[in-house]
Curated annotation (Swiss-Prot):
InterPro entries: DCL-like. GO terms for cellular component: nucleus. Expressed in leaves, flowers and embryos at globular stage. Residues 1-69, 168-202 are annotated as: Disordered. This is Protein EMBRYO DEFECTIVE 514. Residues 174-202 have a biased composition (Gly residues). It holds the Pfam family DUF3223. Keywords: Acetylation, Nucleus. It is found in: Nucleus. PANTHER family: PROTEIN EMBRYO DEFECTIVE 514 (PTHR33415:SF12).
Amino acid sequence: MAEEQEIVDSLSAEVNPDQKVDMEVETATPKAETGDEKREREETEEEENGGESKKQKVGEEEKSGPVKLGPKEFVTSVAMFDYFVKFLHFWPTDLDVNKYEHMVLLDLIKKGHSEPEKKIGGGIKTFQVRTHPMWKSRCFFLVREDDTADDFSFRKCVDQILPLPENMKTPGANGNGHGGGRGGGGGRRGGRGGGRGGRFRR
C-alpha cells in the first residue's frame, strides 16, 4: 500500500511539476549523554574491541608525545629525524660538535640505542660527523675518552624513541631479513654494464 502511495505521489509530481509535495523530514536532535549512558557505551565498545579501552589507547598515543633530548624537544619522530638529517649534512666533517649538540646526541644514544652502555663505554669525549670509511657516506661518530671512535645510526635511535613511519625506517629493520645491500642490477638500465653512452656501436 505504501508503495502504491509513493508511485501515485511521484506520478502526480511528474504530471504537475508546479505542485509542491510536502515531505516531513525527521530531524535527529542531539541528546545530551548522561554519565551512566556514556559509561555503558564505553563498556560496550570495550567489549567489542576485545577488552581495549580508550584509556589504554590514549596511553599508547602519549608515547608518541613530546620527547626531550638534552635541551631540545621533539613532538614527532619525523621532526626528530629531519633535525638529525639536517645536522648531519650541514655540520663540517671531522669537527667536534658544540656542547648543545653534544647533549642532544648523548641523550639520543642513552634513550634510543639498543646497547647504550656498550656504545658509550668509558665515556664520550665528543661527537663528530665523519665520512664512513666503508660506506663513503656521512655518519655520526662518537669519540670516547680513550680516543676510540665508533659510528651509530641516528635513524635506528630515533625509531626506538618514537617509531618512524614505515617508509622512513632502515631497509631490513622490519625483521624479515630482507633489504640492505645494493642488490643486483635490474630496474631501468639493466644489470651489468650499460655504463655511459648511447646506442651500441659496432
